[in-house]
Amino acid sequence: MISESIDTYRYLGKYIVSCQEKNGAIAWEPSSKIDPWDHVESAMGLDVLGFEDNSKKAYKWLVDSQESDGSWFSEYKKEKVTKFRKETNFAAYIATGAWHHYINFENKKFLQDLWPTIQKSINFVLEGQTIDGDILWAKDKSNEWMDDSLLTGCSSIYKLSLIHI
């Protein structure tokens, strides 16, 4: 039986906060790169550890940095885009994070406020779905869909692998 309380792990939340920039973005390490997937993972860590205000700042960054097509670029450094790919699994993951935040804080207003951003991100993901049902991995720097679908089940996106014999 585990006897530690959540307070035992608050130092981890403090570390995540040390990686958070003023605009709410959470880097891999202080002053390091930012990607939307790990950013959401970090926000969920903040949720579990009780850092609600910092988590909300993280989601605000997602709202503020979302592209008009509902996506995010795959990598940022400070406020500059460093990788221009737009990945479907990154776009979909905000929905998972938002639900996680709700489970921790039961804040319906948070979900309502975030809903337009989630809806745009899911629409982006669905635009990448092929006739076979798989979801293309990403758009490239030219904003064209890449002809590739991931086999991973990440972000609760089902991606089908077609085997051609």
Question: Which functions belong to the PLM regions below?
Answer:
Residues 23-41, 49, 71-93, 97, ...:
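Carbohydrate-binding/catalytic loop surfaces
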Residues 39-40, 158-161:
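Residue-level signal for cytosolic alpha-helical hairpin/rod architecture
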Residues 1-37, 48-72, 76, 125-132:
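Low-complexity, Ser/Thr/Pro/Gly-enriched N-terminal "stalk/linker" regions
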Residues 163-165:
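Conserved small/polar residues in nucleotide/adenosyl-binding loops
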